[in-house]
């Protein structure tokens, strides 16, 4: 079994979606100042970095992040590559083996954007007809490798359609170093009461293939993963 950490690092260099507050990490107490311990204050949006969008994000009466069943956030997931297009619609999604799948993670050209120092509006996204196709095929969770599943100048149509039809959205994934295929997704958002979203730690697990070595996180060369 291999474990892949598909969560972006939270740091002050993290790009944020336009209009969201920047992430700030400030020391409250510090050993270097003679305090008893290191304690920091974090200021951030509920939609910073790798995060989950529940229905409450676009509907005041929708389920909040703490009300989502964990069974929805843990289970088999298909990681599919969709490269060479910014607008991912029905035509592109029809090429994917989605029969019987409930969780879909889209690895797109967005993967390169995490290397940029600032937010980029030139990212791949779902179109309205793509969102409609996912609902028709029974997908319950869709993830993507940048900060929004919808185009930058979108009016929320894609978000609302997905969320109103029972899909939750996992945004801000780091899928670099992870090949397309079937995995077990474990996504644990912070349990924010009434939350319209929450940062999440997301990992993928796959079976170790015969003849392979130790299990390493693809985003670091330092520590093997149990």
Report each predicted region and the residues it spans.
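Active-/binding-site microenvironments in catalytic and ligand-binding cores
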Residues: 1-226
